[in-house]
Amino acid sequence: MIGGILAQTLSGQTILGSESLVANFLSPDLWTIVVGLLGGRIGRDSAGDTLAEVDFLPLLLWWSVIAAIGAALAARRIRQRQQTSWGDALMSVGFACGWWWLMGMWELARLSAFVIGWESVEQFLLATPQFFQATALAGWLVQPFAFRCGEQRMESGEQHQNHSATQTSHSALLSILVSRRSALKSVTALIAVYVVTFTAMNWRLWFNLRVPHGDSAMYEEHLWNLWHGQGFRSYLDQGLFLGEHLQVIHLLLLPLHLIWPSHLLLELCESTALALGAIPIFRMTRRSTGSAHAGLLMSAAYLLYFPLHFLDIEIDLKTFRPESFCVPFFLFAFEALELGQLRRTLILLAIALSAKEDYSIIIAPLGVWIAATAWFQKRANPHPLPPGEDGHRPGEGSVAPSDAIPESSAIRVPHTSPLPPGESERGSRRRILTGLCLTVFGVLYLLLATRVVIPWFRGGAELHYVRYFSKFGDTMGEVVWNMLTKPRLLWGELLTVKTVLYALSMLLPVGFVALLSPGRLAVALPLFGILCLNELAADPRHHFHAPLVPVVFWASAIGVSNAGRCVSRLRSCLPLWLHPPTTASQTADSFARQFVWASAFTSGLFLSLSPAGIAFWDVGSPMSLWRLYAHDPRADQFPKVFAKVPREARVASTDFVHPRFTHHERSYDYSHYRRQIAGYEDRVPDDTSFIVIDTRHPYSDVKSPGEVRELQTEPDRWELLPDDTDGYFIVLRRRPSGS
């Protein structure tokens, strides 16, 4: 414990002393407050950089108090659950502080990299203290309980052998039913909390005029224009939206939109859809581990997973993306696949693919995985069980549900009879054929979409997202060819600190347990590689990583059941004197199940924009409650503007008020972006009758009427309406022709 406290103290001095390092945890305002509370001082060095000096003893006292309070609470919990002595309980808790040595290792590695001059390693370490801290805290939180649970489970298993088989079977069945029902209720409650929380955040951003039209509210305009006969488009697009993406999944919301035509509906549906992904995760984990409690913990990890939060609200506050709907459909498809329900799998995959054309880059490798798995299973077991028939994954034997019966004993689920040899042979061939067809389909669909369909809707122009890969060329053909023929350029862009950070951001919040099912996780590798090469956003704070999330949790739901088996295999490979304890497998299983949710929670503390993250409550953070969700006076002034613009008007408006005019006759973007509808010139379309400018939005470059482009270039064509908004908005009306 003492060593862990010292490690946290020494690394804490380094982090709190550097403005760039502490930015991974706190805003400058909160940093100033924390340094002051610790009796430290903030100043500048000779180069003008802001530094802080924090004394060793106050920080040591702070971490000692945290360790003492944590030890007391954990020991009390252990004694209540396991009827052990204070000494044994405190010993378990003391060992848990060994996880804090990770911060000492980070500090030592950072100093070593600096002394040696290994710049890439130093750069990586300077960018990752929050990841090391999240892992250290997660291990500290769950280690005492995992260790004691492993021992208790072994003891309970030994005692259980003295009971009669009939009694065991009856009590086991009853316990399983009660456990599953209770866990499912808890999952439902967690889903409800997520939906309420994120819907409230999204709606508050909308009412505060914080939601942009581009790449967010424009999708509601698609639905409005479609059922008003103006086509599947917004007027940001050069034509129909199919010239941007083969993305039609949000049309599933059209029946609801007919009843409630509002962007708020889309926000509610997106948050609900993302939250519902917890259901297949719960069921897959429960089946793979035999434990409803493990399923509950994995579902909690999913809902705490900070990359999921950024699918609901992106870092640039784009609050609705159709891409998010792929997450639940992929997860339900993976669950159906684990159950051997191929027809249902294909239907769900087709719906997920409608979220974006490049999600075929998930479907093609998934087909390879299905075919390869079926082929290897056929070779290993010529008479396999029916997929999912025994409640477990295809091709695997029965798994002892080691904690389905109040986390205590191991009851083996009986095998069912295998299929007749001919039937199983046909089943294997069918899965191999299905996998190969999926692979071919994925490749052909991507080629057809990107080389034929989308260019046709764009009038032959190149895809807009080719510019995200400008280092490889200016056209899709050049990009692909250079990736294939210039390996040095390709690997030079892939093997970077940025790629490692991206991988850490996806895997660390699930405690790396997804790596315990490497075949499933590999399904995401091709798309992950492409995302690492794009120059726009190579981190999971936008929407590009949406299809990676379901793959990570599919692999985690299955991989979490492999922890004990991995330890057993390791034990068999080691010499006798290096063997871990006999309880190591049970401890590893218990630890993995708890480490997942703890990792999601602690990483979210430093990286999530939700109320589970520090940034939400940090007064100096740009993502804080006080900056984004508190009352905004712009919202009070806007109704005065809206009342001046008739519904039949054709309106050009700035991005953050643009969503309020999408139900007018026409709704155009007012910016310096040159669009087809304005003849690719820096002006509004000719039929624009009103211009509305928000002078106080975050990116406004127009603060007063004298800066308005139209009043400078065409003052005789535009009339400036009287301002009754205290300068928050500028409204122009086109003068009648001839006046």
Segments from the language model and where they lie:
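Start-transfer (signal-anchor) and selected internal transmembrane alpha helices
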Residues: M1-G3, S64-I69, R77-W99, E119-E155, ...
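Perimembrane helix-loop-helix junctions
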Residues: H160, I362-P386, G397-I411, S424-V443
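Extracytosolic helix-loop segments that constitute the early lumenal/periplasmic catalytic or substrate-binding loops
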Residues: A217-F241, V248-I249
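Transmembrane-helix signature of polytopic, membrane-embedded enzymes
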Residues: T272-H309, V327-P328, L342-I347, R593
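Specific aromatic-rich, kink-prone transmembrane helix
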Residues: P280, D316, P322-L348, T373, ...
